[in-house]
Swiss-Prot record:
One GO BP annotation of this record: sterol biosynthetic process
One Gene Ontology CC term in the entry: mitochondrial membrane
Top-level enzyme category: oxidoreductase
Name of this protein: Squalene epoxidase 2, mitochondrial
Catalytic activity annotation: squalene + reduced [NADPH--hemoprotein reductase] + O2 = (S)-2,3-epoxysqualene + oxidized [NADPH--hemoprotein reductase] + H2O + H(+)
Gene Ontology molecular function, alphabetical: flavin adenine dinucleotide binding; squalene monooxygenase activity
Protein task: Catalyzes the stereospecific oxidation of squalene to (S)-2,3-epoxysqualene, and is considered to be a rate-limiting enzyme in steroid biosynthesis. Produces primarily oxidosqualene.
Gene name of the encoded protein: SQE2
Organism whose genome encodes this protein: Arabidopsis thaliana (Mouse-ear cress)
Pathway: Terpene metabolism; lanosterol biosynthesis; lanosterol from farnesyl diphosphate: step 2/3
Membrane topology: Multi-pass membrane protein
Site (described: Important for enzyme activity): Y194
Keyword Transferase: no
Amino acid sequence: MKPFVIRNLPRFQSTLRSSLLYTNHRPSSRFSLSTRRFTTGATYIRRWKATAAQTLKLSAVNSTVMMKPAKIALDQFIASLFTFLLLYILRRSSNKNKKNRGLVVSQNDTVSKNLETEVDSGTDVIIVGAGVAGSALAHTLGKEGRRVHVIERDFSEQDRIVGELLQPGGYLKLIELGLEDCVKKIDAQRVLGYVLFKDGKHTKLAYPLETFDSDVAGRSFHNGRFVQRMREKALTLSNVRLEQGTVTSLLEEHGTIKGVRYRTKEGNEFRSFAPLTIVCDGCFSNLRRSLCKPKVDVPSTFVGLVLENCELPFANHGHVVLGDPSPILMYPISSSEVRCLVDVPGQKLPPIANGEMAKYLKTRVAPQVPTKVREAFITAVEKGNIRTMPNRSMPADPIPTPGALLLGDAFNMRHPLTGGGMTVALADIVVLRDLLRPIRNLNDKEALSKYIESFYTLRKPVASTINTLADALYKVFLASSDEARTEMREACFDYLSLGGVFSSGPVALLSGLNPRPLSLVLHFFAVAIYAVCRLMLPFPSIESFWLGARIISSASSIIFPIIKAEGVRQMFFPRTIPAIYRAPP
């Protein structure tokens, strides 16, 4: 076989030289991206060029046959194509690295450093965001003696249609953090359980609170009022500083997050530094991409209304209507207001502006709500204050980064049907507080990194149980044309109606009072088996066996992907992970 020969070497060398200059003389990026990929590419080109020259020299000695013009053109084409492909790969690799790093700025970046002011306050912890998670965390770490700097985009009272129901398990965490008085003086309502409605029937599900103090129950309220109370609580500590501003990026040095860059409402740029930066900027976080691998799913949208001056059929209970095509949720948020959330599957909504949404609510949804609140529902629709909120689900998939971690909805989300978000956030804060307590000096980078790694494992049993239940229950409650899914939905309602352990067990999981992953899986498949057993009565048939197999398959297809995303080992076997064993430094 003849060696590969490049006859028109000068032109090929010119092409390689121009690509090499392009690679080595690109302007430096303001992001903290290493140029190792470009350097490696340039080295590879030089070696390839040397090999080509050597091949040419050898072939010139051993061959006297001149290539035809078509062969020369082919060599030129191959050389150009190779150069183009190499540059494309390098460029794409660079862009991918930028995307994955998110808004992280290197401390070596000097382009705009002279236009910024450094905040030198001896801060121990920077918290980005002062919502439920950020405010509670600021107060908690402040009580531990940490010097905390909180940066929040807007301190005005927020008006949200979610984050209004705190489960009893979350209230217990609130007590553990010393924040239980934050649900007082905001007209919060006690919640003692749920009532499920389906096809004219209903079943009452009470929280298993017999072993707890009389004050322990769920709480429902205006989210904004609750958050404002926690912010006020944090401000009572002299070592906690709240500042209004927008964090634009994290500051990185040698792979460690050193602080944040932020802009005040006046437009001034500042940099603040601390050994630990905790990002709690909510479900719309623009910083999470540098600290985790976000896989956000939006299965549906909540359409929110406020029903005024009406009473629910069962006082102090959340009401869930298993409607068509999806659930309708109602609960009190004050002594005179009821929040109604209508779930609309998918991401395509009837437009609000042209009245299509109002028509949908009055003709499709109103006939399914309980009779006692139907008139108030229609009145709220006609009033026109209709709001929407996409329902997001995102399993926690962190990128362990020295000096920083994520918390709250910025880190982990689940379908809000079960109201478990605040419970997960508060439980995470308790875990983090206990982990950081032995570390007297947060500047101990090695110890801090190990404890942050432990946090991601220790939070899993509680968080993954609530996450899995929320996402799985939503899929079960959805109306479906599939016969197996329909049977599963019917069986779930009837299973919970049996009472005793069949209702108290699932409700204890939902409320955060007994967040055990194994208990969740057992109850979930107990519902599926209950559905199959009903099909076999009074006499089994081939059709019932086939449908039963489809029910088991459907149940497995619902829960196993969720468990896989949460992490099987961390969820069920956390003690096998070395990261949870950390001795005090």
